Amino acid sequence: MTQRTLHGTVLKKVRTSGFRSRMATKAGRRVINARRRKGRAKLTV
């Protein structure tokens, strides 16, 4: 049986690339605005 190699952690994902962590920094806010301009359905994870 093959082994699953990717074990994602939801909490870690949210802390690094969630909405509130994006809004906390200037660069993160730029990311959000760029995704809004592009018309992304999902801004963050």
Swiss-Prot record:
KW Signal (keyword) present: no
GO CC entries: chloroplast; ribonucleoprotein complex; ribosome
Cellular localisation: Plastid, Chloroplast
Keywords recorded for this protein, A-Z: Chloroplast, Plastid, Ribonucleoprotein, Ribosomal protein
Gene Ontology terms for molecular function: structural constituent of ribosome
Family: Belongs to the bacterial ribosomal protein bL34 family.
Protein name in the entry: Large ribosomal subunit protein bL34c
Taxonomic path: Eukaryota, Haptista, Haptophyta, Prymnesiophyceae, Isochrysidales
